[in-house]
Amino acid sequence: MSKKRILVYGLSNIFGGVESIVLSIINRMPDYYNFTIILPKGECSYSDKFHSSNICIVSMTAWGKNPFNFRKEMSEFLKHENFDYVWLNLSSLSNITLFKVLHKYSTAPIVIHSHTVAFEKQGGLKDFLILMLHYYCQKKYLKAASCLCACSKQAAIWMYGDKRNDIKIINNGIDADKFGYADADRMKCRAELNLGSKIVFLLMGRLCEVKNQSFALDVFNKIHNKCSNVHLLVVGEGDLRSELEYKCKVLSLSDNVSFLGFRNDVNFLLQGADVLLIPSLHEGLSLVSIEAQCAGLLCIASDGVPEEAKKTELLHFLPLQSGADSWA
């Protein structure tokens, strides 16, 4: 029996929640599927995770960087490659070029997977154009999809509108055995990071506006002013790292905040922490909140995190509008 070929689109070069979910699904699929993953040109921070023999990586110009080059490269690629399924992992439907090229060069069934409740705003005219394209493609191209999925009800409404009843809600899942609490791992993690008896707060995710780490630093600063025996671990990479590091310096928090960058041992770091902060402006579901609850970690999340993320009494919601003082 020939292997089924699946084209995967929508992953970035920075390992985040979407990348984690997609790779987790791929690694659990039977070996009679072959996956071709399209990634933006440039260095991929998680290339070591593509160890499976049934995964092929194709680099392509990102649509947001140059739509014309993207159209040319994607068209040329699909002219010479045939797939059994196309799996689109999207934060919006604004990539009209993608839908046009797929319509012209591919007959494979399309699966659209919504991972968020809004696109990441950059300000100005670009945001307006993305929103207009999103709603245009919602009306014109959704009918071409064979299957519509979302990680939460809110993510479904954002991507597909509120009038459809054919959407599959697939809550982000984790390997519970991997994230279960272990006292030995907690002691080891705290020893390796020289945390001692400090109360440890944790931030995890791509360092970007939507994750709202700057607000978390304001919260941590107020906590530190009340109790000096605290430390903040910031896990992840992104465009705002330098800005956040500078803010720590201005707030005189450099000795109390550790930027750990991209890590493969998220489960290990969760063991060493006491509180997870999730101050995101919006989330599709928040994979890390599920992982943290499994590890027995207290979680404080913004009202941008869907209610579906609450699996235990360890997760508590606070509105961002209440401000840093209330959070602290």
PLM regions: where:
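Active-site donor-binding acidic/aromatic loop of nucleotide-activated sugar
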Residues: 240-243, 254-263, 269
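Carbohydrate-associated surface elements
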Residues: 154, 173
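Membrane-proximal helix-turn-helix segments that form the acceptor-binding/catalytic region
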Residues: 104, 130-148, 162
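Short His-centered aromatic/hydrophobic patch
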Residues: 88-95, 114
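N-terminal strand-loop element at the rim of the active site
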Residues: 8-69, 74, 241
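Aromatic "clamp/platform" in nucleotide-sugar-dependent glycosyltransferases that forms part
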Residues: 91, 262, 281
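A conserved mid-protein helix/loop that constitutes part of the nucleotide-sugar donor-binding site
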Residues: 16-24, 199-222, 239-245
